Amino acid sequence: MITVSNLAIQFGKKPLFQDVNLKFTPGNCYGVIGANGAGKSTMLRLISGDLASTKGSVTLGPGERLSVLKQNHYDYEESTVLNAVLMGHIELWNIIQEKDTLYAKADFSDKDGMRAAELEERFAEMDGWNAESDAAMLLSGLGIKEDYHHRLMKELGGKEKVRVLLAQALFGKPDNLLLDEPTNDLDLDTVMWLENYLGNYENTVLVVSHDRHFLDAVSTHTVDIDFGKVQLFAGNYSFWYHSSQLALRQQQNQNKKAEEKKKELLEFIARFSANVAKSKQTTSRKKMIEKLNIEDIQPSTRKYPGIIFMPDREPGNRILEVKGLTKSINGEVLFKNLDFNIEKDDKVIFLSRDPRAMTALFEIITGHEKPDAGTYFWGQTITNAYLPMDNSDFFNSDLNLVDWLGQFSSDTSENYIRGYLGKMLFSGEEIYKKTTVLSGGEKMRCMISRMMLRNANVLVLDTPTNHLDLESIQAFNNTLTNFKGNVLMSSHDHEFIQTIASRVIELAPKGMIDKITEYDEYIANEELKDRRNKIY
């Protein structure tokens, strides 16, 4: 259990939030949401003690352990993968280390024996005999193969290190668990494993995530950080979203009616204020105005970008034809002999256990890479716009945003470019910001602006929700759902896929599967599960 009392944090003269009083109880998972910069990660750091509060306190239940998903991937370079996970339970790890040191002594004394007995008792109480198997189970569930368990952390890639640190946070089933963006760099299958794990977790969990499906699957409550306030709501993200939208509409309607009534009363007063016979009625109406309740609706810190794709022309019946496409990297086959046709109105999610397969396919069909074998043909009516996963090559110049976006526009007037930047929430002096100082989310919004300028009828999107906040993802999602062209995409966002894609194509070294179906139906189909395993 975590109790937050009168908590406040201030940076300089600006308070981020204040007077926060919350209680987080066992058996519940709290999804922490808010716009970028609202203070989600700061809240977790305050609770963990990594950041000192300006005022207030955070207390845990007596004897309880708190575990945090660490963000520094290079802290354990000289440790084995398995040991890095065991270090997640620091008391148990220290006991293991002290035991090993004692038993390695050449002059093992009676005093050492007594200390060893104490350690063994505590070790057994903490289920130490199952520690390594429990750690291995977590690693396997998170997609780290057994071959890697005894390798050094420095031998792993960045995405694998993220998974090890997640296993470390989960290890030993801590009483209180803080997870900041735990689904980053996880594939869809691993996210599903984590959803199931947290869904059955009996202790207290706080999680920050931009994955709506994940939040809905694991959260029993929602912590909303907005207006500089921190509020707790029962229910998951979708319940909070629909409830808050309904409450806002109701307040707006109530205010509208009150404003109309006020106008009507003021008109009566203006008309009859000089009429002595109507003096009682005008006085009565003045009192009625005083009683009218018109509440201020505070502007939210949440901002939804205006993502709009307007194709110059309607696509014809021939969209894309792929024949015998094959691609390998360093002798490793990503896909072989791909054959498929994209039909009009298709919105396709491409899947693979190796994310390099989707990136390679998209790079080939957009002309940025060559296949090892095979061909592809775009229809004559087709214009495509590509959103690559790695956009670093687009931002290696020292241009400001206006000049940067102007490179991709036939109309380079500042007002025209400013309009597109404004749609993606760049306003005022921000449009003169240098591209070299942009955050990941800002770069992604620039890339989407670039796509909008293309007026394309086919959108090719490689993990398009990377670095975007919930509001941008929601806006992107809504636009693609209603888009009147074709969408070819990869994604790790379950909700994004489920609400957009009408067709699934899975790529693998030994074959492919092509189904016109929704994503949820595809992954639930038992017959397809066998077929999917056979193509890898």
Where are these regions (language model features)?
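ABC ATP-binding cassette signature C-motif
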Residues: 1-255, 312-536
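Proline-centered turn/helix-capping motifs that create local helix->coil transitions or kinks
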Residues: 277-281, 291-301, 377
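A structural signal for long alpha-helical coiled-coils and helix-turn connectors
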Residues: 103, 241, 270-273, 277, ...
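Short amphipathic coiled-coil heptad-repeat segments
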Residues: 136-142, 267-271, 287-292
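ABC ATPase nucleotide-binding domains
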Residues: 251-273, 278-287, 303, 524-536
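Amphipathic heptad-repeat alpha-helical coiled-coil/stalk segments that mediate oligomerization
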Residues: 297-321
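Extended non-transmembrane interhelical loops and adjacent amphipathic helices
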Residues: 113, 186, 283-294
